[in-house]
Regions:
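Short, solvent-exposed mixed-charge patches
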Residues: 108-110
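Thiol/selenol-based redox catalytic cores and closely related redox-interacting motifs
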Residues: 1-103
């Protein structure tokens, strides 16, 4: 692990950002955004089979689709901000642009 990566892990993988050190996963997106753990309640997937989850992903009104696809869209928008909206075929999508606009209003202190 490089020194810069080690510094990121040391900062974000410890209180007050997590209950205790070792609370992975966390994602750092280009130093712009850090997401700690999942952005939805894992209980929404509890007791579902892989087939049920797959079927639910096909229904945009399902809790599973809203959780998983919504989270993916947030990660995509954050990545687009970090890459200067590249690739435009993805980053130019209306949904992603709308989420980007919201993300850009978030004030973060480090």
């Amino acid at each position: 692990m490089t020194a810069s990566i080690s510094a990121i892990v040391s900062k974000w993988d410890s209180p007050p950002y997590t209950a205790q050190a070792g609370q992975f996963p966390f994602i750092d997106i280009g130093g712009y955004f850090t997401l700690l753990n999942t952005s939805y309640d894992p209980a929404d997937l509890a007791n579902l089979t892989w087939n049920q989850i797959g079927n639910d992903l096909s229904d945009p009104t399902s809790t599973v689709a809203k959780d998983v696809i919504g989270n993916a869209n947030i990660l995509t928008a954050a990545t687009c901000i970090a890459t200067g909206d590249t690739p435009s075929s993805v980053c130019g999508m209306a949904t992603i642009q709308s989420i980007e606009a919201g993300l850009k209003t978030i004030k973060v202190t480090t």
